Design a protein with these regions (language model features):
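Conserved beta-strand termini and adjacent loop/short-helix elements that scaffold enzyme active sites
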Residues: 1, 97-99, 170
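Structural beta-sheet core signal
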Residues: 37, 61-63, 96, 141, ...
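Conserved G/P- and acidic residue-centered "switch" motifs that form tight phosphate/ATP-binding loops
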Residues: 42
Length: 172
């Protein structure tokens, strides 16, 4: 047959439908609230978004662009990633934040040893403001513990202290 039609007869009526299609599993997107995903352009942040969507979280995304330190190609990659995961995360918004001036300010005024953690704290503060304006209840990151030197427990605690929303890290 070209198309299989299924008829389910119940005490109170009948259902007519096509064949079952296996979904991704998990909870319906949006049933667990809404969060802002920090979309970096690497593989970890879209994987984190996918995992949180499977747990029912609706998502928006934020990306920090700082040309000339990051390229236009990197921004296009992030936009493509956001579109790629939309079928799994539901309707989303992508916020691209120009970050060159804050990055240069931190570089010019902070000790080199604190540069990365201060940038992360600054990004978290900005993300926190946007998340609240969008009605989001948490932030999501693709951070992995000790993947890089700045992702230690102490560094994560320092980043967390910069803002007040819960930070969900499904890859840890």
């Amino acid at each position: 047959p070209q198309f299989k039609v299924i008829v389910e007869i119940r005490d109170y009526g009948a259902y007519i439908h096509g064949p079952k299609i296996q979904g991704e599993g998990g909870l319906p997107v949006g049933t667990s609230g809404r969060a802002l995903n920090m979309l970096s352009g690497g593989i970890d942040s879209p994987v984190a978004a996918y995992r949180m969507a499977k747990r029912g979280l609706g998502l928006d995304h934020i990306h920090f662009a700082s040309p000339p330190y990051t390229s236009e190609r990197a921004k296009l990659k992030v936009k493509a990633l956001a579109q790629l995961i939309t079928p799994y995360t539901g309707s989303t918004n992508l916020f691209v934040v120009p970050y060159t001036k804050p990055q240069e300010y931190i570089r010019d005024n902070a000790p080199d040893v604190l540069f990365t953690v201060l940038m992360r704290r600054s990004m978290m503060r900005i993300a926190n403001i946007i998340a609240r304006k969008q009605g989001c209840e948490a932030l999501v990151t693709g951070e992995s513990l000790a993947q890089v030197a700045s992702q230690t427990v102490k560094a994560l605690q320092c980043t967390d202290a910069a803002q007040d929303l819960p930070i969900l890290r499904p890859l840890i």
